[in-house]
Amino acid sequence: MAELACFCYPHLENDSYRFIPFNSLAIKCMLTAKVDKKDQDKFYNSIIYGIAPPPQFKKRYNTNDNSRGMNYETPMFNKVAVLICEALNSIKVTQSDVASVLSKVVSVRHLENLVRRRENHQDVLFHSKELLLKSVLIAIGHSKEIETTATAEGGEVVFQNAAFTMWKLTYLEHSLMPILDQNFIEYKITMNEDKPISESHVKELIAELRWQYNKFAVITHGKGHYRVVKYSSVANHADRVYATFKSNNKNGNMIEFNLLDQRIIWQNWYAFTSSMKQGNTLEVCKKLLFQKMKRESNPFKGLSTDRKMDEVSQIGI
């Protein structure tokens, strides 16, 4: 995750701003600079290579002292920064909006995936600039639309029906902020269209998840799509989701947290997010992740949860 101000800076032209991507040498200057505390939140002038991000964001970049940041000296950093600027320059950002736009925290990996989609000649985003910019505006939180299959970050498609597409995320292959744990495996499920879904299509998805992904929990981060994650990583997701929810409320970004379809979401996660929305503490909410829940009556006739061992998928073991 990183603020948009880590990728570009605003240049006032008439009554609105044009956004310009940072170059890696300017960032490198900023990372070596001694800057007064009072100037930590201001864009840094490298004198030689142009404007650099505010020094308060130093930890967002990979250095000898911090291996958890972005690999800003890779070509991918420039591609992501240029893509963000293209999207921001396609809309009008005024002086009253610029600070809130640049303070938005975005998923670096999501944006790298959009660059990868853009460069894939077989992908619809390669052929449609309008759809590409729409996808970026959704990714950076500027659009109220949800991420659907056409505008999704992408990955490897492992399941699709008339209503849903399930992607295996490819973060291990990334260059900007790769996942270093080689055991990482995670999926995302997007809706093909933002409209009501028939019961038969939901049933198809649930059957696929129970047969093939029984070692995973289906959760949501509240943004209109599902995530399929290892049970061992659920607590980590809970910490992140709770922190983001609290931060948004504190900053006045009252974004509706979408609980999605209770029949698809793991029972304990649904309880956790419902409790979070009611204003309970993280400790109270997380207890619900580890409680034994009363099994819901099966919402679909003919869809059994019982499987013989040789029928059960070994994915995730």
UniProtKB/Swiss-Prot annotation:
Q: Name one GO molecular function term.
A: nucleoside diphosphate kinase activity
What residues sit in the active site?
Answer: H225 (for ntpase and rtpase activities)
- What is the enzyme's class at the highest EC level? hydrolase
Q: Name the segments for region: RNA-binding.
A: 205-241
Among its keywords, does the record have Magnesium? yes
* Gene Ontology CC: host cell cytoplasm
Primary location class: host cell
State whether keyword Nucleotide-binding applies: yes
Q: Which cofactor does it need?
A: Mg(2+)
Q: Which UniProt keywords apply?
A: ATP-binding, Host cytoplasm, Hydrolase, Magnesium, Metal-binding, Nucleotide-binding, RNA-binding
Q: List the cysteine pairs that form cystine.
A: none
Q: Which GO terms describe its biological process?
A: viral genome replication
Quaternary structure note: Homooctamer. Interacts with VP1; this interaction is weak. Interacts with NSP5; this interaction leads to up-regulation of NSP5 phosphorylation and formation of viral factories. Interacts with host DCP1A, DCP1B, DDX6, EDC4 and EIF2S1/eIF2-alpha; these interactions are probably part of the sequestration of some host SGs and PBs proteins in viral factories.
| UniProt record similarity statement | Belongs to the rotavirus NSP2 family.
* Name of the protein in question: Non-structural protein 2
